């Protein structure tokens, strides 16, 4: 039985019209010639040769469909040899007389059915005749009917041997996982002899003459076998790399950004330029058989040090022990808020406060600066914070604190903010009765009930006397709503945390919230242990923001009982004191410590991923509340709404699993010295260790490691040029850059617009942009159009870009305000190259 020979053909006329004429039996003077085939002369040895004439498909659905059979014909061996090997042509009449009608039916019937021209094998001629226009248009869309050889040359290679190997393997020996680019790369590995260049070829017939007689045809089958073996080895290597990366990342809790960086770095270590070239050398035809016997090679390139850092940095225990740096110093004495400022002066309540609005604060500070010229306070809120932080002042002018109070204080004064009637009041409190107020309005369960009771039961047992409207005076309002200001000049004894956690779904069960609190408590204690000794029953207070009512109380009877009805986010305040003898100083240590807590929680949140997407954010706790001028609402207080209503009461959520008797925990949650940043609840006598530096020494490890692998960016271009050439920028632009720019401008710009650039000056605006101005004036006329009015409002500037240390690319750009020029959008006109060497 004769072997079917595949041949890719082209026509010397419109190919789509030629196909339609052949199918309908119309006279056509055109002819077909061979571009490429899959046989050797010895394969055409029978009396009759069966030819499958094919065309490339524009959008192949798979490897098997890259070229589609158009006609199946039988030719005498001599005619077939002339067509395949000697640039012979087949006339349209020859094809019409010898093509298989059944094969043509199988090829074109699907197209005719889509066009609504369906017919059986005997009516295909009539169908094409009646719908010729649609049929020809469909052929142009389905097949790649190019008339130029340049598409083939640009796609499959510009040299004879590589072109024949790649195109023959692509069309006649389909490999499902290969692309043209892959085959081109493998052809370079397979044969270093590229053959004659194809750049002089101008017609498809010339290209076919070269390809059908090329000696590379004898090597196509061997090349195909090499491609199969090479791709099998590549698949083995890639699967090993993927398996290593996936197994490793499955053990780590990574954010989306960290995950992208980790995968990028892992693949970069395996497939960077040097490693990939070395692997390519090991898998060339000479070495492939030996390499096939070895274990996967590329996966071994993943650096062991990188693996170690990943394994330790993204592990909770090793992260805290290896990557958290603390620096502290012992000092004596260290004073926070005065103790008298945190309690009432009378057993029955009552407080002593100073309050005022921002303008009153400013007026007072101006007066103080006049009377006490050595104090130099800022005459704004910052000055009030500095004044409140004064604990002991030795000056001949005295102490300006008497402007706030005549009471003697043993420490700093707490500064609060309270809102009433859409006004914000700043308060300095010298004696505070809020604990007395809390005892009257918050009812704790009896001590006997607290023995052995579950935390969730205690949470439900606490009763608040809820209020709904703002008070009538500031003195009363600070009982129900106040914010404490963080003072960077004071030591921090209590770690106050603000949790704002987006939740995946609403109506949280109390057990879900309790599990979250347990995770936070464990993470907080792990970090506190780095600072000093911490007991297992160390108190960590949680205050959950009350939910907003979703309906009127009368309509809520039919709704299922749910502890939390929050739908978008869960708000909580978390407060704990630092270990005995430890405090922090300044904003930066608190910020860094909170960042570390966020990371620890993300590393241990595997069981709570259904509650919130922890990995999508930087962490659940706000790190911005420790800056100067930042305040945070006290526990057991309300948020004031837009209309003065009181909402979002911060209620105690009990989480104290290590203690049997939890009544002291409940009582301490009502003590002011346990809830404020700078309040000291322990014996103030004796030296304290002040932590002044907290650092994650490997912070943004993956991001920084990724940046190191990226190409170096030369950002400080102008200083680099001046340093390299030892000359001023102006001299360099006038002597080297502007002559090239002006020559380019002169070649395409009219004489009228060219005159604007006869005398120019240069004004650098940053490290890589230089504005070009006329010698007189600031701007130019539009360089593209003649706008109505023709005002000089166009800015021109040069963008300097260092491609390498000695290769400078200068881009000439302009900005025109006219609508026709897209309203001040920067427009690039041209670029010139300047060699700095």
UniProtKB/Swiss-Prot annotation:
Known EC number: 2.7.7.-
One of the GO BP terms on file: bidirectional double-stranded viral DNA replication
Keywords for this protein: DNA replication, Host nucleus, Metal-binding, Transferase, Zinc, Zinc-finger
Zinc finger residue extent: CHC2-type: 782-821
GO cellular component: host cell nucleus
Feature type site, description Essential for primase activity: 498, 500
UniProt-listed InterPro entries: HSV_PRIM
Primary location class: host cell
Metal-binding is among the record's keywords: yes
Localization of this protein: Host nucleus
Keyword match Ribosomal protein: no
Function summary: Essential component of the helicase/primase complex. Unwinds the DNA at the replication forks and generates single-stranded DNA for both leading and lagging strand synthesis. The primase initiates primer synthesis and thereby produces large amount of short RNA primers on the lagging strand that the polymerase elongates using dNTPs.
Protein name per its UniProtKB record: DNA primase
Organism: Alcelaphine herpesvirus 1 (strain C500) (AlHV-1)
């Amino acid at each position: 039985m004769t072997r079917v020979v595949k041949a890719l053909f082209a026509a010397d006329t419109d190919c789509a019209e030629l196909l339609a004429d052949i199918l309908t039996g119309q006279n056509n003077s055109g002819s077909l010639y061979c571009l490429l085939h899959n046989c050797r002369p010895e394969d055409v040895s029978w009396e009759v040769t069966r030819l499958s004439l094919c065309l490339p498909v524009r959008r192949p659905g798979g490897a098997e469909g890259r070229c589609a059979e158009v006609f199946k014909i039988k030719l005498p061996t001599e005619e077939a040899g002339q067509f395949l090997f000697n640039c012979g042509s087949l006339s349209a009449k020859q094809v019409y007389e010898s093509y298989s009608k059944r094969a043509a039916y199988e090829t074109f019937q699907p197209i005719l059915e889509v066009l609504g021209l369906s017919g059986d094998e005997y009516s295909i001629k009539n169908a094409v005749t009646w719908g010729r226009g649609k049929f020809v248009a469909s052929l142009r869309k389905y097949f790649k009917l190019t008339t130029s050889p340049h598409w083939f040359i640009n796609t499959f290679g510009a040299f004879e041997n590589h072109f024949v190997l790649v195109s023959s393997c692509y069309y006649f020996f389909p490999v499902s996982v290969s692309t043209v680019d892959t085959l081109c790369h493998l052809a370079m590995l397979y044969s270093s002899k590229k053959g004659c260049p194809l750049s002089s070829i101008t017609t498809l017939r010339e290209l076919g003459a070269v390809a059908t007689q090329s000696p590379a045809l004898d090597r196509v089958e061997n090349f195909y076998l090499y491609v199969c073996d090479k791709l099998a080895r590549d698949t083995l290597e890639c699967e090993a790399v993927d398996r290593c990366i996936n197994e490793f990342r499955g053990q780590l809790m990574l954010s989306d950004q960290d995950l992208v960086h980790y995968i990028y770095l892992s693949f970069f270590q395996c497939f960077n330029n040097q490693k990939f070239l070395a692997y390519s050398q090991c898998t060339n035809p000479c070495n492939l058989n030996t390499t096939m016997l070895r274990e996967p090679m590329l996966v071994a390139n993943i650096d062991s040090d990188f693996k170690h850092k990943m394994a330790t940095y993204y592990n909770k225990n090793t992260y805290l022990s290896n990557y958290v740096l603390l620096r502290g110093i012992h000092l004596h004495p260290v004073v926070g808020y005065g103790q008298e400022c945190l309690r009432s002066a009378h057993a029955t309540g009552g407080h002593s406060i100073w309050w005022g609005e921002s303008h009153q604060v400013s007026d007072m500070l101006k007066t103080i600066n006049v009377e006490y010229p050595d104090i130099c306070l800022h005459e704004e809120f910052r000055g009030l914070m500095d004044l409140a932080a004064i604990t002991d002042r030795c000056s001949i002018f005295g102490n300006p604190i008497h402007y706030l109070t005549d009471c003697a204080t043993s420490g700093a004064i707490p500064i609060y903010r309270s809102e009433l009637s859409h006004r914000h009041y700043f308060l300095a409190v010298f004696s505070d009765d809020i604990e007395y107020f809390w005892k009257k309005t918050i009812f704790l369960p009896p001590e006997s009930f607290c023995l052995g009771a579950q935390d969730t039961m205690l949470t439900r047992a606490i009763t608040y006397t809820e209020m709904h409207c703002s008070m009538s005076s500031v003195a009363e309002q600070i009982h129900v709503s106040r914010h404490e200001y963080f003072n960077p000049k004071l030591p921090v004894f209590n770690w106050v945390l603000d949790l704002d956690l987006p939740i995946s779904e609403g109506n949280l069960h109390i057990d879900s919230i309790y599990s979250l609190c347990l995770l936070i408590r464990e993470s907080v204690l792990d970090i506190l242990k780095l600072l000093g000794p911490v007991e297992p029953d160390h108190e960590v207070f949680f205050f959950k923001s009350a939910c907003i009512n979703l309906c009127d109380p009368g309509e809520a009877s039919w709704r299922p009982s749910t502890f939390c009805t929050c739908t978008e986010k869960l708000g909580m305040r978390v407060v704990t004191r630092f270990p005995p003898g430890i405090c922090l100083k300044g904003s930066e240590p608190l910020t860094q410590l909170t960042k570390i807590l966020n990371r620890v929680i993300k590393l241990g949140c595997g069981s709570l991923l259904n509650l919130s997407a922890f990995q999508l954010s930087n962490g659940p706790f706000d790190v911005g509340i420790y800056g100067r001028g930042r305040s945070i609402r006290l526990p057991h207080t309300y948020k004031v709404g837009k209309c003065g209503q009181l909402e979002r009461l911060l209620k105690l959520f009990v989480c104290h699993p290590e203690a049997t008797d939890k009544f002291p925990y409940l009582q301490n949650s009502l003590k002011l010295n346990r809830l404020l940043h700078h309040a000291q609840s322990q014996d103030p006598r004796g030296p304290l260790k002040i932590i002044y530096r907290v650092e994650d020494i490997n912070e943004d490890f993956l991001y920084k490691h990724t940046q190191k692998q990226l190409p170096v960016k030369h950002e400080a271009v102008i200083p680099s040029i001046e340093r390299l050439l030892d000359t001023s920028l102006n001299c360099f632009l006038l002597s080297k850059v502007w002559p090239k720019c002006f020559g380019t401008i002169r070649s395409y710009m009219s004489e009228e617009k060219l005159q604007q650039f006869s005398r120019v000056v240069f004004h650098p605006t940053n490290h890589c942009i230089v504005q070009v101005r006329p010698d007189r004036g600031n701007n130019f006329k539009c360089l593209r159009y003649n706008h109505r009015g023709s005002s000089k409002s166009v800015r021109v500037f040069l963008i300097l870009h260092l491609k390498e240390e000695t290769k400078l690319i200068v881009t000439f750009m302009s900005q025109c305000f006219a609508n026709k020029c897209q309203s001040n959008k920067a427009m690039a006109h041209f670029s010139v190259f300047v060699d700095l060497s």
